[in-house]
Each structure stands twice: as structure tokens, then as C-alpha cells.
Amino acid sequence: MRNQRNFFIAIFAVAILSIRIADSQAQDRAPQDQSWNRRVDGAGDYQTVLEVSGRIEVSRAMKSYDPLDLKSICQAKKDAERRAFLSADGYLSALENSVEANRRQIEIVQLHNELGQIWSYRGDMARAIEHFEAGRKTLAEALRIHPEFSEDLVYLDEILGVSYLRKGELDNCVHNHNAETCIFPLTKQGEHKLTAGSSAAVKYFKQHLSKKPDNLEVRWLLNLAMMTLGAGSAGSRDDRTPIRVPRFTDVATPTGVDQITAAGGAIVEDFDNDGFNDVIISSVDACESLRYFHNNGNGRFTDLTDKAGLADQLGGINCVQTDYNNDGLPDIFVMRGGWEFAMRNSLLRNNGDNTFTDVTEASGLLSGEHRTHSAVWADFDNDGWLDVFIAHEETPSQLFRNRGDGTFEDVTRKAGVGRSAFTKGATWGDYDNDGWADLYVSNYGGENFLYHNKGDGSFAEVGKQLGVTKPLMSFPTWFFDYDNDGWLDLFVASFVPSLTEVARGFMGLPPQAETMKLYRNNQKGGFEDVTAAAGLAKVVPTMGANFGDLDNDGFLDFYLGTGAPSYAALMPNFMFRNREGKSFDDVTTATGTGHLQKGHGVAFADMDNDGDEDLYVNIGGFIPGDRYNKALFANPGNTQNWISIKLTGAKSNRAAIGAKIKLTVVDSKGKESFRYREVTSGGSFGASPLAQHIGLGSSLKDGKIAEIEIQWPVSKTCQSFTNVEANQFIEIKESATDYQLLERRSFALAKPKASANPHANHQPKKSTKRP
């Protein structure tokens, strides 16, 4: 494995910082995390993306805080940002005005870099560029005395190229957003009209490549910069086999769900049971609250955050729905601290009137001791109440059993699932069809775990035995039956923060790092690695992800949100279409969903009740300056059939999580096929509705589903309904003798306004505010 550039900034950072922060408050600091850059033997030989974000500089200045007080955490992060700036700025001023300035030019260069990084953190790229330019100029002068740093001048060119490209994004994509901005490959509407940023980026990238022509990362970034100017190439990543797939359109802005925030989770669910799917998003920014967008049923959404009592729910790297009290109202669980430092999570009870109450402490789930990125709900002991596995980073993960009275007990030790790892994802699923929910845990920087549920309240770890411990650098994960054989398969995304590996993929070069993994259930209690056979031996640095059926053919497709904290991590998100359970095709370009901005919480859902699944993505980066508009990709529809099934438990948990659905479908020629689903919200970073949307294909005998079978986890009953009309919404209650037709009014999602010149009002935004 290669370390990233042997850059002077890294060489001198520790020495300079030790001078400036060896103060009486040094022991009052929060523990800091360098986990983004961790490596592990066996994960591949790859180059990590150049760091331009300021997150390291600001995190160094973080001091003590109250992990249970969300406002305290917000203030502590603000203070850290200001402290980092004042420290570097003050030291630079003193050094530049000292008699030793000429002798200590390298330190001056490093301090300019540090200030450039801090301004980048805030998103003020004009000021960041001022410091990066000043640092480059000083370094060029210093080479007369320090020729050993000549190569580092080349990497400052890359930093400046990235910074100018980001400035171009801010001027064109963020401040003057339209539905085509940052959709790869860029259309004419997506090209930059304010070209100063990209033009300067091209200059610096070319300067870098004149010295380092083999740097694939910079070649990729140069190509993107050229594309924003109307040149460049889209590469050849999409599979070329002709496939009919719909092209989606981003309608987040006209529908009112395009809130500009940092990275976070996304839940699409009908929170008030009015028949329309609503949206809740979180933000990793400790000063940004949850946002609740209520579906009005007319193509638009209303922001009910304040009314819902969610304005004080600050921060949250991820979120997921549950129904912990079995009242039929979807509750919310918010996870915090992932990639950062320990802080509290939140359990929010749905009151049934579009308001929520924080019951974290009352439920027994309040803690400030952990960093959490993932949590997953299931009834692991089949007592009819949803339990929760909370996956922590580095500290032992926890399993909480629902007592059925609104409180939880920690049964981690008894269950045997408390291993310590840097856990980034988890998913429940009954992979061996024995009626008990099993648990898969995805770890970043180590082997993954598969816990087999023994049915007595304890689990056996069988991951290594069954060969499902990889990727070693993994992130989101899920169980799904991709081949419709009635047995859950396992998908695990890799997270290798390497732009070079993405470029290699587009150039048709073999990967040098870990790829994603698809494990096919062998129906004998184990799995087979079919990644290569399924066409998925690709390196995609995945963060948010989920699965759904984009074309109603009945086979589950999936979407991968990509990125890393650095502004240099510009790569498309990816859509993969399932080819009848045999393999997957990259249909990113064809579907128009290849957003270049960073993809986090992902949900597939029918937002307009028209019988196809749309795609909601929480777009935005990890740092405050990398906020972006969320995306709602509207599905244009197709001629294939579908059914939406809402299950309601009685003896089993009310949300029916873990219940199994089997559809028998007969086409017009008499051929029989099957569809299988297990009720979940999907992947571990993004939550789709619990009501199951199931595609049926284009040809149905008499327009009906031959049979619907439901298997319930607690009562062990199996319901069967025959000759059910397709293309409708139904509800099936546990033990009921018939299903209920649900009235669901369809409507059109608001569309972007047509404009001959989408950039007519372009004006670059300026910032003069200091941190």
C-alpha cells in the first residue's frame, strides 16, 4: 500500500502545532479521529484522495464538551473552528513580521496551507485560494534554500486546482442551482457559465500534470474541469448492452425538498398515516437540525420542522424509522458521532399529530460514551417488540431488548454481539430461513461479523466460517433477495477513499483496491461470493446506499452514494440495474442519477403514488462548507405492473419488520415466476418506506397476482390471498382473512421551470465574514 504524497505540510504540521498548542488547556481536548485515512493489510494498493477540507485542522482545536447537550456540541465545534483560525492566523502574522521570516519560510508555507484549509472548511474558497496562492509563492522563493521541497510545489498546484474547481462549483452549482447541475456526464445545462473557477483549475491541473503526467487523480479532475467548460469526456463506465431504463429528473427544488445542508441520513416514510410519503433528513453539522418535509399530496412538500418540535434536534450523521411502542406511528432514531467523537443519540416518539417527543432518556437509550453511525431495528427474540442494535465506532456495539413498556435493557453481553470494531453499518435478515433475525455488521478497517441467531437470546459469530468477512474497508450493507429464489443474499459496499480507483474504473483498468461484495445465498446455510460474476467487481467509494426497483421488473436494483470529506473527492454516484437476478448493469448515465456531489442517506420510494419508485438522496459533504441541495429524482414511469403492500402486525411487531412476502406471478403465456421480500427499510445508510413496493413485470395473466403469501415471525402463521388485482395499494393485517384496499390518490410532482438560459441570474457569491 502506498502512503499519500510525502508532503511537506504533513512533515511540518506536528512540529509547528506543538509550538502553538502546548498550552495549559491541551489536556482539555476532545479525542480526535484520523479514521478516514486508516488502512489495513489486504485492502489493496491504492492512493487516497488529496485532502482539501480543513477537517483535520479544525478537529485539532476541538476541546471538551457535554456529549449529552446538543447545543453544547454545536458551540464547541464553532469555538474549535474559530480557535483554529485565530491560532494559525496569529502565529503566521507573528512569524511573517519576525526577523526569522526568511529563515522559516517553510513554516510560513505550512501556515498558509493551514489557513487555506480552514477557510475551505467554511466554504470560502476565495480566501482559501488567497492563502494557497501565498503559500505557493513563498515556497517557490524558498526553493533556493530548500530545493528538496521542489516536488511539493507540484502538489500545491493540485490543491489550487481543487480549490478553484470548488469555487466554480459554488458559483455555478450551489448558488445558482438547476436540475442538471453536477449530473455526470454534464449536459449543456450543467456546464458552468461563470467560468473563472474552472478555467483557473485547468491551468493548475495542467501545471501539475506537466511534472506528474501519470497522476490519474489529477487527470480525472482535469477532465471534470474541462467538462464544466464544454469539453472533456464522460469515459466508458456504463455497460454498453442496450437496456431500456428510464431517465430520472431532479425535482427537489420545485417540490420543496432541496434543503441545503451537510451530509446526513434520510428517511422516507408516511409519518402521519395520510397516505403520502414524507421526508426527514439529518445533518452531520452539529448546528443543523433535523428537517421534516410533509408531503402535501399536490406535488409539493411543506417544512414542518418547527411545528414538529425537531428544531432542537441538532446534528445526526444518520437516522432511521422504527415503531418501538407498537402504536402504528413511525418513530425516529437519530445517530450521532460517526467519524467524529462521542455524543448522544436520540429516540423520538411520534405523537400522531406531526409532532415528536424526545424519549431517549426515559427509554434507557441515553448515553454520551459512543460514536455511532448505524443502528438497525428488528425483533430478534420474536416477542412482538422491536429491539435495536446500535453500532459504534471502536467501542463495543450494543444490543438493546425492548421490554414492551417503552424502555430497553442492554443485553449485549448475554447476546454475545459486543465486539469492538470501527463499525459503519449493520443489517438484520433471516438468511437461513429459520424464523429468527440474524445480524450482519460492517466494519471499516477490519473483518466484518455475521451473527447467527440461535433462538435463545444469544448469537454465534459465523462470518469467517461462512466467508463473508470482506471487504475489510466496508461501509453500508444490506440483506436482499436479488435473484428472487426465496433466500436472502448479502451486499456489502467498500469504502476506499480513492479518486484514482474511480478513474481507473472509467478507463477500463483493473482495480487495485477492494471492490464491493455480493454474496449469494447457497440455500444451505452459507454464501457464495458472486461479485465478479454479477459484474460488480468495481471500486466505488460508497457512503449512503439503498436498493429498490427502478423499472418495476421485480428485480431489486441499487444506488450508491459516493465521496469522501475532501473537495477533491468529485465522482458520480452510481445506479446499478438488476438483470433478472443474474448480473448488474451500471446504468448511471442512462438514468441521469450520476450526481457528482457527495451522496449520503438514500431512499427509494413512490413519492407521488403513481406506481413507480422515485429516488431521494441526501446530497452534501462532511464539512460545513460542503453543503449541497438534496436531490429527488422523479421516476418518469414505465408500462410494467406493480403492487404496494403495507403489512400490520398483531402478535408480531406492528411495523411488520422481518415479515416475509412471497408473490406468485403468472404471465400471459402461463409462465410462473416469484417475487420475495422481507420487510425492512433497506440499507444501513438511508431508509425507504416499510410498505413494500414490488414490481411485477410487463405481462400478467388477467392483470392479477396469482397468489400473495405472508409469513409472520411471531405467530408463525402464513396468510394466502389469490387472484389479487395488480397496480394498487393494499394493507394486510396479521391473521386477517382478507386484505384491505387502500385509497391512495396519485398526483404529479412539481417540475423544474423550463428556461432557455438556466444561468440567467448567475452572480458569484462573495463572503467577507471571518470564522
Stretches found by the model and what they are:
Residues D66, K71, T138-V154, V162-Q207, ...:
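Short coil/linker segments at helix-helix boundaries
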Residues K77-E96, D124-E141, L194-V202:
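Helix-turn-helix repeat elements of alpha-solenoid scaffolds
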Residues E169-K193, M335-E340, A493-P511, G561-A569, ...:
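Short, conserved, GDST-rich strand-edge loop motifs in beta-rich repeat architectures
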Residues T249-A262, S283, T302-L314, W339, ...:
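Short loop/turn motifs that recur once per blade in beta-propeller domains
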Residues A263-N273, H294, G316-N326, T372-N382, ...:
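Beta-propeller blade termini
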Residues A266, D278-S283, G328, I332-G337, ...:
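Hydrophobic beta-strand segments that make up the repeating blades of beta-propeller
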Residues A534, S583-K598, A603-P771:
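Gly/Ser/Thr/Pro-enriched helix-cap/hinge segments flanking short amphipathic alpha-helices
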